[in-house]
């Protein structure tokens, strides 16, 4: 165990005090938020205020790899609801993400969840059917083709699903949206006693996922629908709501967001603090009162550079596979230095935060 009660250098502490930036709120946007959810938000605010960042890793098998090879365990585990999407279940997808989340939470870890939401339509396009419908000028549904196989159905290019049209409550697709939200609610309900950093509709402004393909307004409307249905209809009061874009045009509003975040996949060798992205998120809410996080990273930012620049990310979550295991994005020497840093919290250092 490394020294975990960080005392900020006087100059750094003075910089935080005199920065003019408001302390992030510890009050969740859901007024019925559970006690564990409130405790989690308060813990995140407290640790960020101390100048520390929580380490995080996407997928349990990769978090275990970090433990075995780096020598420390990440605080945060990221899992994906992707294969609980009804359209993917219909095609035979099976997921253990909820079981993985329960396992890690039992060890004292914090859970964050994203959702690569599989396109909602029942209309799967084979190569032959797509060719026929393109001839008629009316393709519809997921392109389950050689070029775009079914498992890519969260990508814009793999589906003709139109969110703008689907947000009409009288449409068939709106009913499918509600069906999917309700199906995901069943899975999230299994975590009802575990606080969750829920990060839906991520990277929307990029347009590469269908939920961002028709612009900001339909996406914001879908996010608000998710919030209302999961909190009010399903009573999922264990969720803290994480927005994932730095573009003001896409922001759904302070009343729907507990944490603002962005995903950053920097060039190889770039372990900078990502100050520009941090400052953009600072200005996003208008009042500087939200926690700021890195929802996904390819390259882990150097904690010393974060401190020097004043980019106080509450947490970061490294993406899975070669992003964490390989030497190109995060060399082993660098990984070990980051996890050993007194500026970075690891799993052993946050035990008991939810008491």
From Swiss-Prot:
Glycosylation sites: 50, 144, 162, 287
Amino-acid positions noted as binding substrate in the UniProt annotation, renumbered to this chain: 208, 265
GO cellular component terms, semicolon-separated: extracellular region
Signal peptide: 1-22
GO process annotations (BP): substituted mannan metabolic process
Keywords noted in UniProt: Carbohydrate metabolism, Glycoprotein, Glycosidase, Hydrolase, Secreted, Signal
Active-site residues (renumbered): 203, 296
GO molecular function: mannan endo-1,4-beta-mannosidase activity
Pfam families named in the record: Glyco_hydro_26
Location relative to the cell: Secreted
Domain (GH26) ranges: 35-348
Enzyme class: hydrolase
InterPro entries for this protein: GH26_dom, Glyco_hydro_26, Glycoside_hydrolase_SF, MANB/E
Documented EC number(s): 3.2.1.78
Catalytic activity: Random hydrolysis of (1->4)-beta-D-mannosidic linkages in mannans, galactomannans and glucomannans
Top-rank lineage group of the source organism: Eukaryota
Family (UniProt): Belongs to the glycosyl hydrolase 26 family.
Task performed by this protein: Endo-1,4-mannanase, a crucial enzyme for depolymerization of seed galactomannans and wood galactoglucomannans.
Protein name: Probable mannan endo-1,4-beta-mannosidase E
Gene: manE
